[in-house]
Regions:
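Beta-propeller domains
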Residues: 1-135
Length: 135
């Protein structure tokens, strides 16, 4: 096959992810942390892009709570796997002012917050993650 490169839109993003179970095949959706407008390389939300044959468009956005910045999102597929975007995005977030951290779980289909897990210790911004299903 061939690989092509094109601009998705004029919003700055980094660390794009897809549902890892389709790695190596054409993805219908991608999930990108959005660079905050008032902070250098800090991410204030996630954007879901739908990839068409010749275009891509942002279809949904999840905004982190005010004062929080997040990192790269890992895709955790739903065991029923009805569609490529049937699963959850898991991203770590940090509120530096409050010295708090949390794991945010976002429904990948609707981009709505499903759960917040508050962590007992603050973690650094830029923390990467990878979803590993249990055995």
């Amino acid at each position: 096959g061939t690989t092509t490169e094109r601009m998705l839109d004029d919003v700055a993003t980094e660390f794009p992810r897809i549902n890892d179970s389709i790695q190596g095949r054409r993805a219908a959706f991608g999930y990108h942390p959005r660079v905050a407008k008032r902070a250098d390389l800090m991410f204030d939300g996630l954007i879901k892009y739908a990839f068409g044959d010749s275009s891509a468009k942002a279809v949904e956005t999840w905004n982190a709570p005010a004062g929080w910045f997040v990192g790269e999102a890992s895709f955790a597929p739903n065991e029923t796997k009805r569609s490529e975007d049937d699963g959850f995005l898991v991203t770590f977030g940090t509120n530096a002012r409050e010295q708090q951290s949390a794991a945010f779980v976002i429904d990948a289909k609707t981009m709505q917050l499903a759960s917040t897990v508050h962590l007992p210790q603050r973690i650094s911004l830029g923390f990467h993650s990878y979803w590993c299903p249990g055995f």
